[in-house]
Amino acid sequence: MSIFKILKIITLGGIICSCGNSSKPLMINFSIQSNIKKNIISNADTLKLSILNPNNKKVDSVAFSMNSRRISDNTPLKSIALGEKILKATVFFEDKREVALLKIIVVNSNTPKLYNYELVNTYPHDITSYTQGLEFYKGVLYESTGQYGESKLRALDYKNNTILKNIELSPGYFGEGLTLLKDKIYQLTWQEGRGLIYDVNSFESLGNFKYGQSKEGWGICNNGSQFYKTDGSENIWILNSETLEEENFIQAYTNKGKLTNLNELEWVEGKIYANRYQKNGVAVINPANGAIEAVIDFKDLKDKVRIHPGLDVLNGMA
């Protein structure tokens, strides 16, 4: 290395150190004070906010917001969606402005009800299928199966397990949940970042759609005007029924905390039914705020099916 290069590096380093030493520590004058305990509050409560001002600055005004939406310093939470929130206080003082932030969690006020089930009938099913999604549409059962190199889309006569239509997915796709709307089938892939669209009658491909912030596809259902999609977290993403773009999301919470690994979904009488991967229960979720209103216990259902080496976990609802 030449002397010029060494001097150049030393000089540049000196400038960086000099600039670094001249900077002053950021003064924090305000913080958010609330009636929240351990950053958790119930949606039955009223959020009460104020500002801590230890340096006795002359405050002109304070503007509060929750996830960028303006709120007052006395806000009932009954109409607020559950989950993690960022509180922001913008403080105007002495011709200046300073922002204080606080992360909180809004949980449900009620404990989920516990439901059991009644087995009313059984039907034959292909035990080699790694079922990911099921849905009835005009009397036909549609099934999406998983595993790389084995994923399929099928239409079935469920009473005798006759395959009416069947297509194999590309070996690079791991099939996940599916739903049907307006004579179209929407099938998710797991980690491939896109969903597949088919004509319900011919199974002809009608294109695909890309995921947004949700990086994986697990389960999907619809209410006739919107799609709801899971990604394995506590989030349920709300998709536009025409563009398939993610417009919003809700977070599934009980009175104690979030429920993760949300998987297959089904829309039933205004509620979202969601099973959890590797769990034996199905959560009944309020689509307006993410509240888990009930849990259906299916733990003994696994004992009622044929035991074989490929048996894995409960999955698929229709």
Where do the model's predicted regions map?
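C-terminal motif of bacterial Sec signal peptides marking the signal peptidase cleavage site
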Residues: 15-18
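Bacterial signal peptide processing site
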Residues: 20-23
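A short helix->beta-strand "capping" segment at the edge of beta-propeller domains
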Residues: 108-127, 158-164
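Blade-loop segments of beta-propeller domains
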Residues: 161-198, 204-214
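Beta-rich, blade/repeat-based domains predominating
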Residues: 127-138, 171-182, 212-224, 256-268, ...
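Edge beta-strands of extracellular beta-sandwich domains
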Residues: 97-106
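Conserved beta-strand positions in repeat-built beta-propeller and related beta-rich domains
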Residues: 143-147, 187-192, 229-233, 274-278
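Short loop/turn segments that connect beta-strands within beta-propeller blades
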Residues: 157-161, 199-203, 241-244, 286-290
